[in-house]
């Protein structure tokens, strides 16, 4: 590797809006403020909700439902 052409790789502090603080390595050179992290994101906490209440197939089946069928 060539010398003196690579950015400095330093330890910084990433602070989430939920209060979680993480020490990470980065070339950014300054501390970061995060909106979400793995401690408060709905996908990782299991508190996610289903936003899609029906797709195109459900709309088709609803529109062309045959009387007497399931």
From Swiss-Prot:
Classification via SUPFAM superfamilies: L28p-like
Q: Which domain of life is it from?
A: Bacteria
Arranged from A to Z, the UniProt key words for this protein are: Metal-binding, Ribonucleoprotein, Ribosomal protein, RNA-binding, rRNA-binding, Zinc
So which cofactors does this thing need?
Zn(2+)
Q: Does the keyword Iron-sulfur apply?
A: no
- The residues listed in the UniProt record as binding Zn(2+), with positions renumbered to this chain, are 16, 18, 37, 40
Give one GO molecular function term: metal ion binding
Free-text cofactor note? Binds 1 zinc ion per subunit.
Q: Which family does it belong to?
A: Belongs to the bacterial ribosomal protein bL31 family. Type A subfamily.
Subunit structure, as described in the record: Part of the 50S ribosomal subunit.
What is the protein name stated in its UniProt record? Large ribosomal subunit protein bL31
């Amino acid at each position: 590797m060539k010398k003196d052409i690579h950015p400095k790789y330093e330890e910084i502090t990433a602070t989430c809006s939920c209060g979680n603080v993480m020490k990470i390595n980065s070339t950014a050179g300054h501390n970061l403020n995060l909106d979400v992290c793995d401690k408060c994101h709905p996908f990782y906490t299991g508190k996610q909700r289903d936003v899609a209440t029906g797709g195109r197939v459900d709309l088709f089946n609803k529109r062309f439902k045959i009387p007497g069928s399931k």
